[in-house]
Amino acid sequence: HTQGWIHCHSAATDASGIVKCVMDELIEYFENMKLPGKLRIALACCLNMCGAVHCSDIAILGVHRRPPRIDHANLRKVCEIPNVSASCPTAAIRPATVDGNPSVEVIEERCMFCGNC
């Protein structure tokens, strides 16, 4: 989602609170044009660092610390299992059968906690 100069490309981190805090601190610089040039501020939700944080003047990185929890009973109702598996950049999510129903499992050692799933 995009708000001001700070943006996030996935739902892994809610950028609203971070945007508010950062812009509250920097608003004076933007209002009075105290900066020598354009200032690029970017927010990335995970270590993939989309949002061009690698080439920004100020980069904010959201770090998640826990693997996703799986609701095996409702998984098939809310998503397509092949898409969930394909969304994982490290192949930490793979199809599995739980209690006779199709589901997924997370290999925690491979998970980078990006929230893409």
Regions found by a protein language model. Name each.
Residues 1-78:
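Small-residue-enriched alpha-helical segments and adjacent helix-cap loops
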Residues 13, 79, 108-112:
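A short glycine-/small-residue-rich loop at the edge of a beta-strand within enzyme catalytic domains
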Residues 44-45, 105-107:
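Glycine-rich, charged/polar anion/phosphate-binding loops
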Residues 64-66, 70, 96-99, 105-106:
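Acidic low-complexity intrinsically disordered segments
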Residues 83-103, 110-117:
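Iron-sulfur cluster-binding cysteine motifs and their immediate structural context
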